[in-house]
């Protein structure tokens, strides 16, 4: 279990809720929706399209056979870790009006989130920034909304001291900007006019083609 997923479960348990897990070693979307019906689950935690696509396929199959799953108890689906595409979010919302919470972060710190509903249509890789988060260009400029530049996302607040016995990686990731200590896990983004960001992906996974940078989220969105 990841630290982030553990935090979600701990929060529910501390509030008097119940944490429900699957006994299956693999992921079975039909089994998940059956369990949601049986237990009247309110919150579902997933990891992007890797889970959401088969979940949507299962809902579509059930609807096509006039045996739709009962989703009336579901209030929110929470995702983090990999891309959750606009197409799949819209598909889920057709079956049930709920909140789709897409969170962006890493072990080094939380950065942003987005919430989609039928009245607030989703956008792929669009996030509102958490307080204390900046986007900084490679030349050190702190970007403002509407900038044409692309920058690294940095988060302040509860920033780790460093990586154990890895001074080089620690110096690359944890830096001070104007006297404030930030964590820069390596994610690039563009800061839009409205103050939201479009996440482009991890710089270490970027592909250079004919002088242009192609980011992971751009490739995944096309696929």
Residue ranges and their predicted role:
Residues 134-155, 173, 190-194:
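Conserved beta-loop-beta connector loops within the AMP-binding
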Residues 6, 22, 47-48, 79-80, ...:
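Short hydrophobic "strand-cap" motifs at the C-terminus of beta-strands
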Residues 14-17, 41-46, 56-122, 128, ...:
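Gly/Ser/Thr-rich phosphate-binding loop
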Residues 122-128, 173, 179-180:
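Short Gly/Pro-enriched turn/cap motifs at secondary-structure boundaries
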Residues 3, 53, 109, 151, ...:
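Glycine-centered loop/turn positions within well-structured domains
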Residues 1-5, 220-223:
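Short, intrinsically disordered, charge-balanced linker/junction segments flanking boundaries
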Residues 3-45, 54, 58-63:
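Conserved AMP-binding/adenylation subdomain of ANL enzymes
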Residues 44, 105, 156, 161-162, ...:
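AMP-binding/adenylate-forming catalytic core of the ANL superfamily
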């Amino acid at each position: 279990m990841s630290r982030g997923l553990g935090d979600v479960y701990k929060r529910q348990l501390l509030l008097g809720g119940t944490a429900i897990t699957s006994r299956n070693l693999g992921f079975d979307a039909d089994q998940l929706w059956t369990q949601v019906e049986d237990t009247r689950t309110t919150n579902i935690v997933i990891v992007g399209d890797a889970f959401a696509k088969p979940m949507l396929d299962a809902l579509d199959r059930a609807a096509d056979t006039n045996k739709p799953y009962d989703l009336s108890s579901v209030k929110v689906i929470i995702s983090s870790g990999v891309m959750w595409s606009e197409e799949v979010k819209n598909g889920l919302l057709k079956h049930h009006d709920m909140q789709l919470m897409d969170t962006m972060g890493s072990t080094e710190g939380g950065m942003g989130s987005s919430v989609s509903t039928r009245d607030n249509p989703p956008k792929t890789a669009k996030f509102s920034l958490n307080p204390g988060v900046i986007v900084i260009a490679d030349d050190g400029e702190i970007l403002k909304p509407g900038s044409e530049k692309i920058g690294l996302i940095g988060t302040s607040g509860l920033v780790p001291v460093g990586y154990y016995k890895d001074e080089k990686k620690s110096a690359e990731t944890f830096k001070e900007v104007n006297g404030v200590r930030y964590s820069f896990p390596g994610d690039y983004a563009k800061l839009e006019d409205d103050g939201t960001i479009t996440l482009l992906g991890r710089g270490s996974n970027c592909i250079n083609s004919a002088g242009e940078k192609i980011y992971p989220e751009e490739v995944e969105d096309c696929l």
